[in-house]
Amino acid sequence: AYERQFYPGATSVAENNIGH
């Protein structure tokens, strides 16, 4: 999730919360 936080469209809702 951390490396994908720059690509919100590729993250799930849960990962998006972790990334941001």
Swiss-Prot record:
Residues 1-20 are annotated as: Disordered. Signal peptide: none annotated. Optimum temperature is 60 degrees Celsius. GO terms for molecular function: coenzyme-B sulfoethylthiotransferase activity. One of its GO terms (biological process) is methanogenesis. Keywords: Cytoplasm, Methanogenesis, Transferase. It is found in: Cytoplasm. Transmembrane segments: none annotated. It catalyses: coenzyme B + methyl-coenzyme M = methane + coenzyme M-coenzyme B heterodisulfide. Optimum pH is 7.0. Its EC number is 2.8.4.1. Pathway: One-carbon metabolism; methyl-coenzyme M reduction; methane from methyl-coenzyme M: step 1/1. GO terms for cellular component: cytoplasm. Binds 1 coenzyme F430 non-covalently per MCR heterotrimeric complex. Coenzyme F430 is a yellow nickel porphinoid. Methyl-coenzyme-M reductase is activated when the enzyme-bound coenzyme F430 is reduced, probably to the Ni(I) oxidation state. Its cofactor is coenzyme F430. Component of the methyl-coenzyme M reductase (MCR) I that catalyzes the reductive cleavage of methyl-coenzyme M (CoM-S-CH3 or 2-(methylthio)ethanesulfonate) using coenzyme B (CoB or 7-mercaptoheptanoylthreonine phosphate) as reductant which results in the production of methane and the mixed heterodisulfide of CoB and CoM (CoM-S-S-CoB). This is the final step in methanogenesis. MCR from M.thermophila is a heterotrimer composed of an alpha, a beta, and a gamma subunit. Belongs to the methyl-coenzyme M reductase gamma subunit family. This is Methyl-coenzyme M reductase subunit gamma. It comes from Methanosarcina thermophila.
